[in-house]
Structure formats: structure tokens, C-alpha cells
């Protein structure tokens, strides 16, 4: 598995909190050749099951990303933003937004 490619692929997908479907689908496809069964639930959690008697493991991680949402456009073109997810306001000054 090419970890560099995996990271590049997954970070290019939109995955804002509440809209993780594409990220979930990507990971489901990555797991599919390695396990016996893959399901994605209503909350976009990916559950992969490999049959056998070996030790059980669980990988638990967030699939969503934090984001900013435009809540208002001022007359001068400047934007008012609201956060989606856990944006720490201390990191916002001098942060590039695109």
C-alpha cells in the first residue's frame, strides 16, 4: 500500500462534518480486498470484518474534517465565517483560507 498516495487521495476528498460520504466510500473500497465484509452505516462509519480466530483489532478515527462556512458577505466583499466542527479560533489569525 502506498501510504503517500492514500493520504493524498483522502485529503483531496470533501469530508466536512456531516458530509463524509465520499471519504467513507473511499475507505470502504480500500478495505474491501483485505476483508470478508465491509459496510457503511447511516453515520458514514466504515465497518470492516475479517473472519478468523486471530486477535481482534479496532481502528477508530474521525473521517470528517473541520471547515469554515461563509455566513454573510459584506457590501465591501469581506466575508463572515462560521465554523463547522471544532475549529480552534486561536489558529485563525494569519491563517490562509481557500
Where are these regions (language model features)?
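N-terminal hydrophobic/helix-forming segments and targeting peptides
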Residues: 1-98
